[in-house]
Structure formats: C-alpha cells, structure tokens
C-alpha cells in the first residue's frame, strides 16, 4: 500500500502540498504547472518537466538559480502540450524561454508541439534534449540515449548561468556544450510497484538488473547480486568505455550518485565510496559530488551513476551557486 488516495489524484495533491509548503512556489491547479513566484523577469527563464513519479524531479528544482517553472504530468506520462505552452507563457518576459526536455518519444512530442505553438506567438523558445543514459536495448544493443538523472546538471548549471544574466543565445550554446559531456547508467535490485498493477520486470531477491530505465523499463542484463563494489565496477567500466577518458586530457569530473526511490542514504554513500575508490585508481579527480534521491522512479530499489567531464571550470562555479530550489 502507498500513502495516497488514488494514482489518478496523487500528482495534483502532491503539487498542492508543495504549494502549501513553500511560499515562493505557486501551483496553477489542474495544469501541472509549478512556478517560482519570486522569479527575476530580467533573466531568461528555464523550464522543464515530465511525468510524475520522478520526484524530486522536476518540481523540486524550481527556484532561484534553477528552474523558473516545471510542468508535471500523470505517473510516468508527460504533461500535455497545452499545459507546457501555459508554462512557457507564464514565465515569458520577452527575453526568450529555454526548455530542457528528457529524451523520450512521448515527452518530445508534447514539448515540441508546445514550443512550435509558442514560437507562432512570437516567443523565442530554445531547447536542449537531455540524452545522458548509455544503457542499451537488450534485443538489438542500440544505445537508448534516454534523458535520466544527468538532466539535473542541466537544470543547475544552466539555471545558475541564467541567474547570472546569460542571454538566450548564450544559454543555448552552454547547453550544447554541456549536454554531450553527461553520461549516466542505472541498476535496480527491485522494480517499481504500483498497487493493483503488474511490475514491468521481475527480479529474484538475489538478482540485479543493469541498465534499467526511470519508467520501470527492464535493463540489458540480469545477474546474481554480488555486492555494491561489483555493481560499481560494472557501471564505472561502462561509463569509462563510453566517455573514453584515456584520450581526454581533462581528468576532472562531476559525479552524481542517484537513488531511484527506495534506496537508503546508507546504501548510496556506501556505493559512492566504492565508486570514488575506483575513480581514484583510474587517476580521475572528482571536483563536485552529489548523493541522494535526485531523479527517482517511484519506489524502485536502485541506483544510477552520472559522470560529467568538467570541460569548463565555470561549470563547477555554477554548481556551487546558491539556489532557492528546495531539492538541491
């Protein structure tokens, strides 16, 4: 059982609860739109969103120095384009609006429709598609390139740059430089559980699935669980191969250790310790690390690991700029 009245009502009730908790945030009922009512109209607003079930993403990242607004849809279903359009209109002050979209077919459809309509209204809307997931399809081994936990780095770095006064053109260029440097891979010990619904995959108590998705999608391989260190080795090696860091002159990295819902902080920090030791052996220096439930998959028991090469030292400054977002 879960502490809500029904799966249909929970996103709306959650957003109303957030509105009641944080005076600086305003929820527009029946729209999924939560916006920062202290937003500085002299800066370019950044918005994002997607289906609910990934909390604190994206509503937890609304606030000064991050998102001006987030649009939330039903559980694992993106918001409708009409509500995304309303969010764009809500925060537009004539300087353009920048949108961060996770790379899922349904999300792209709804966001692209909204952006197209906003542009016909004369709003300068730019966007980036987050595609940090390096998992592969188990049937054809094609890269999935889904937008997952690494998306949060776009929220924070772009948001801080916008707060500093970056123009819409400059924000777009920063996004295009930053996004290709972000890589993520996830693993699960147990799938998402919704009352009265079947899980999307099944694992025995002693099994682990590599490459799972944030909507409960199964991974590319299942094997016996052999401890946190074994999982850390798998994820670090896969990220290493993708990033090809032996050929990179820069050895400075940003690290995110993300819980997928029901993974405890004790587990997350234990896993982080394993990862940090491996990265040290590889000669890499972690200049910024964040651990916690950053982008979840409801109550999935799992972890994702994100690495981002510090191509520009200013990215670290932007990560450390204070923000009003309650989940950072």
From Swiss-Prot:
GO terms for molecular function: glycerone kinase activity. GO terms for cellular component: cytosol. SUPFAM superfamilies: DAK1/DegV-like. The keyword Cell inner membrane does not apply. The modification Tele-(1,2,3-trihydroxypropan-2-yl)histidine is found at residue 215. Disulfide bonds: none annotated. NCBIfam families: dhaK1b. Coactivator for the transcription factor DhaS. The heterotetramer formed by DhaQ and DhaS functions as a transcriptional regulator. Activated by covalent binding of dihydroxyacetone to DhaQ. The complex activates the dhaKLM operon. This is DhaKLM operon coactivator DhaQ. The lineage of its organism: Bacteria, Bacillati, Bacillota, Bacilli, Lactobacillales.
